[in-house]
């Protein structure tokens, strides 16, 4: 069963200049699917369409069989509990502790449930600290814990390691590996190809508003398609030098 289905999706913010143009893709529930593409290619737009934060100008978006593009806001909120959307930044409230920030996902959540979510991201012992008292990696992991409080079936993640140093990136990567081992699928927008090769089951490349490539990470790195080579060549050169 598909978790996420795009059928002929078109989206423009300026008339006559579509960011996405007839894009179609079928994303499996259990897979960790990375969305790659050049800056401005529409990767994040795709993720926001999946979350129902944007509506397509044409085409259809389905999540768990529900027509995201036609749902009223109340139904969208229920759907987002099943597949929460994590923005690029941690989006924490500075005056709330990490535990309190995580609990904001569901005010009915028990303290035990919140602590379990924090434990899954390695922050059980830091729950009483404020965001200003922890580093960027812990803040990002708190945002992931906030999503886990909902007991989601799927995650929509926009650039989970952007702005993080190597140590913080490694911490987030460890959490994502743990979630994958637990069977939780995700759509991950990222330009971090090292993370992609370590974590992804599938890769979707967005170029010129369309689905330019879909395959495994190995197929992605080996592809000779110009749209793919433009992305992978710098990474492969750096990896060879390192």
Regions found by a protein language model. Name each.
Residues 51:
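Helix-to-loop junction immediately C-terminal to a conserved catalytic motif
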Residues 68-84, 181, 220-224:
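ABC ATPase NBD coupling module
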Residues 111-126:
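Conserved ABC ATPase "signature" region
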Residues 130-134, 138:
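Conserved ABC ATPase signature
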Residues 155-158:
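Catalytic Walker B motif of ABC-type/P-loop ATPase nucleotide-binding domains
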Residues 190-191:
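H-loop/switch region of ABC-family ATPase nucleotide-binding domains
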Residues 196-198:
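A short, surface-exposed alpha-helical micro-motif characterized by mixed small hydrophobic
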């Amino acid at each position: 069963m598909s978790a996420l289905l795009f059928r002929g999706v078109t989206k423009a913010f300026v008339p006559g200049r579509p960011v996405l143009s007839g894009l179609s893709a079928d994303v499996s529930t259990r897979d960790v699917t990375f969305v790659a593409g050049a800056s401005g290619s529409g990767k994040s737009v795709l993720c926001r369409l999946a979350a129902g934060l944007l509506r397509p100008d044409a085409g259809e978006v389905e999540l768990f069989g529900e027509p995201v593009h036609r749902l009223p806001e109340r139904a969208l909120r229920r759907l987002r509990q099943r597949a929460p959307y994590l923005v690029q930044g941690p989006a924490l409230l500075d005056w709330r502790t990490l535990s309190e920030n995580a609990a904001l996902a569901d005010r009915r959540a028990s303290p035990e449930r919140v602590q379990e979510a924090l434990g899954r991201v390695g922050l059980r012992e830091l729950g009483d600290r404020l965001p200003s008292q922890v580093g960027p990696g812990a803040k990002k992991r708190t945002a992931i814990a906030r999503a886990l409080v909902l007991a989601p079936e799927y995650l929509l993640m926009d650039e989970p390691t952007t702005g993080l140093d190597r140590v913080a990136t490694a911490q987030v990567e460890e959490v994502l590996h743990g979630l994958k081992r637990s069977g939780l699928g995700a759509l991950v927008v990222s330009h971090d190809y090292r993370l992609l090769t370590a974590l992804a089951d599938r890769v979707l490349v967005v170029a010129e508003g369309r689905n330019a490539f879909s395959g495994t990470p190995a197929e992605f790195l080996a592809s000779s398609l110009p749209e793919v080579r433009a992305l992978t060549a710098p990474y492969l050169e750096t990896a060879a030098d390192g």
